[in-house]
Regions:
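NAD(P)H-binding glycine-rich loop region in Rossmannoid oxidoreductase-like domains
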Residues: 47-84, 111
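N-terminal Rossmann NAD(P)H-binding glycine-rich loop of SDR-like oxidoreductase domains
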Residues: 2-23
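Conserved Rossmann-fold NAD(P)-dependent oxidoreductase catalytic core, especially the SDR/UDP-sugar
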Residues: 62-70, 84-120
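Structural signature of the Rossmann-like NAD(P)-dependent dehydrogenase/reductase core
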Residues: 5-6, 68, 100-105, 140-146
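Active-site regions of enzymes building and remodeling cell-envelope glycoconjugates
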Residues: 38-50
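Residues at the starts of beta-strands that form the adenosine-phosphate
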Residues: 2, 25-27, 100-101, 138
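NAD(P)-dependent short-chain dehydrogenase/reductase
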Residues: 118, 122, 126-165
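N-terminal Rossmann-fold cofactor-binding loop
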Residues: 29-33
């Protein structure tokens, strides 16, 4: 099975891939710390902003599963670009009805208080569901607490503890 991990993938480690996707070919977009490993069937690349190049990856690999890690999984994470990346990936999924997509996001959309962040999270969830309905892509949204890491330099807690040293 070929799996694409995209979005806020700085938290993805080789161990996570081995445990979560044994015997799968895994393409990771956006994690600059993870190195490709042919023996373990891991290809790691920076996120591709050029739609033509992203299309070539979708033509090269026949992804059956896509896991998109939202920027909202990082506490005080970067909010720009998420909707565009989601749109690009979902647009390329329309040719393959067998793809299953899991969108991992934060819990902001379930809060009763409306803010800019809750609106953006809700909009991203709506984009995933609408594209899923429009192209008959099996999509699931999983709301989870914030992720944290002692090695991912973009992580809020990593920055906090580094400054405290």
């Amino acid at each position: 099975m070929e799996v694409l991990l995209a979005g806020n993938t700085g938290y993805v480690t080789e161990t996570f891939i081995e445990e979560s996707f044994p015997e799968c070919d895994v393409v990771v977009l956006g994690n600059e710390m993870l190195k490709s490993n042919r023996k373990k069937n891991i290809l790691s690349r920076p996120f591709i902003k050029d739609e033509k190049e992203l299309k070539e990856i979708f033509e090269t690999y026949e992804f059956e599963r896509i896991v998109y890690f939202s920027n909202y999984l990082t506490m005080h994470g970067r909010m720009t670009g998420e909707l565009e990346q989601l749109r690009q990936i979902l647009q390329l999924c329309k040719k393959n009805k067998e793809i299953r997509m899991l969108y991992l996001t934060g819990q902001e959309s379930i809060y009763n208080i409306t803010s800019g962040k809750t609106l953006l999270v809700s909009a991203a969830e709506n984009v995933v569901m609408e594209y899923g309905n429009m192209y008959q892509i099996n999509t699931k949204i999983l709301r989870i607490p914030h992720l944290y890491s002692a090695v991912y330099t973009q992580d809020f807690f990593y920055k906090l503890f580094t400054e405290a040293e």
